[in-house]
Amino acid sequence: MVAYRNKSTELYATVSEVKRMARIIKASRMSQPSISQELQACIPPKEISDALVDCYLRTFEGVFRVLHVPSFRRVYDAYWLGTTPAKPSIIHKFLLVCAIAVPFYTGPDQAKLRVSAAKWIQAAAEWQCAPHAKSRLNMIGLQIQILILIARQVCGIDGDHIWIPAGTMLRTAMHLGLHRDPSHFPKISVYHGEMRRRLWATVLEITAQSSLDMGMPPMISVNDYDTKPPSNINDEDMGNGIDTPLDVKPATVFTDSSIQIAFTQTLPTRLEIIRVINNLRFDLSYDDVLHIGTKLISVCREKTIFFKSALAAGRNITPFQIKMADTLVRRFVLCLHRPYFSKANENPRYHYSRKICLDTSLAIYAPATELAPGEEDDWTRMTHRCVGFFKSFFLYAMSTVYYELNSQINERKEDLALFAPLVSARPATTPPSLGLTSLPPQYQLLRQVLESSRQTAVARVQNGETNAKGVVFINCALARIDALIAGTDPEVAVLDAARSSTKEMSQILASVYREEHGEDIDLSPSSSSFAGREHGRGEGADDVTGKHLPTGTGAQTGSSNSTDFSCFDGTMDGLNMLDSDLGDVNMGFDIDINAYMQGLPMDSLDGFHFGRSPEWFYDLDGWAAGSNFGNPGYGV
């Protein structure tokens, strides 16, 4: 052992030579990741890059801590000065930051930047998956993994399916030892120890959010790690690899880490909520639901007051970050109470859950800042563009408002029937009025929320989202509500709304393509290998899911589950054709997430379709069904 450590010995020289030959042989067997000329050509100019970096720092960096901002700015400035050659990892990190910022950029060529952002994300993902992965199992590699997951959701690049790569991110972090507190490793500098705590907190938050979003277990518990929360310090207090003691601020002082610390305080509770509501046996008592929900609401209120005071004092925090921090925690309250939401109509004990679900949904919908008509802030831009869990809480909130408004209309009809005269003096030739003579007390407010959600859904398509279903179904929901109020046939109203919405979406999507590419979209069969009904779920889908498990957003050619908007030219039964790719899915589990999200019993019932995302919302038969929406066996 002594001879091996002595660099002057023959053994040391021989071992070094053997290792060097091994590295050369491995390197010769695979190409090294590099920056392609195509990627270099779409790097934005410095003026635009500066604006994009500022957009990122005022939005997501304050919520999901990934970078040490002073260090990042030094490397960023050195890149533009050209003093040192930029490594691929540095360029990918810089471009991912720019990609996340694109939706918040208001300068010229925003539409073309959307196209570039997709290329930046794809290039970073390819670099991350390239051979010789061991060289990327480090802090920079983990930072890039995190940025890719955020960018995919912000830019709508497969952002609705991040639970799987989020699991890879979690395991990468644990492989690097981030689940153990840096105090266990004396050789780690103070700077790197603090960065490890920050990254671990971000990894846990993304894991929790994506697990809640997909209805899946988080695969981590508080017993699996002992890493402490980040210290309450600003980035400038950390140094850069310098082993100096940290000047930790009191908890009452706002710092760059305050939002992340607030997340970690409620994380154990939120992980338990995910475990319980995704448990196949749902073993939480209603008293525990009330206790946990009240605790989370209290924390949300307390932290929002603290962050607002920091904003008023001119600290480094923005309205976007306050709103995002509140919503990402508050959405857990909504999911916790949803199983009891619809039960409140039959059991007064659960009326509090009905109130909490509505209040939470309205809080999520509340704007971050007061805006003039047509004006946008960062929060509005986020709602108009982002997907993943940044979109899901709006779907959950909007569906809650719809269910509540539907319940209020039904209750108002029942109340009016109680006071109706037993005998009417109206001539027999006069048809009875089927509409409501007086509206529910919150009708205007709740309908305004649904109208706002419709405008948001349209804006999302105008800003690059390619899923037109959201607009169609929100229009159907509004049409059904209006028909119930007016006393007209809701099925006819839903069908008319579906027809007009699909035509509107066709025009908007054509306009979006023209804006991004400067030419009209080519719908000929040969224009793209991914166009048309033949795309379905992709090659080999039947080998994985089975022919009778159309679990995605499309189906194979010739299947009865194929999606075709021409179904709106038929009768009301034709609406099944549009939604059939979302229904009729039974994966053999004992629980139905759709039942949970609709507030139905958590046992398995024949006829339910199983889904792990807000796709349960896209059920046109449900919108037309009224009081039957969500009942077993209806529309499936």
Regions found by a protein language model. Give the residues of each.
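Intrinsically disordered, low-complexity transcriptional activation domains
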Residues: 284, 382, 453, 459-467, ...
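Short, glycine-/Ser/Thr-/acidic-enriched flexible segments
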Residues: 102, 210, 217, 271, ...
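Structured alpha-helical bundle/scaffold domains in large eukaryotic membrane-trafficking regulators
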Residues: 68-76, 109, 164, 181-188, ...
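Acidic/serine-rich, low-complexity amphipathic helices located in mid- to C-terminal regulatory regions
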Residues: 55-58, 150-234, 261, 268, ...
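C-terminal capping/lid segments that line or modulate ligand- or cofactor-binding pockets
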Residues: 389-411, 464-467, 471-491, 499, ...
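Long, amphipathic alpha-helical regulatory blocks in the mid-to-C-terminal portion
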Residues: 96, 115-145, 165-183, 202, ...
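Acidic/Ser/Thr-rich, low-complexity mid-to-C-terminal regulatory regions of eukaryotic proteins
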Residues: 223-283
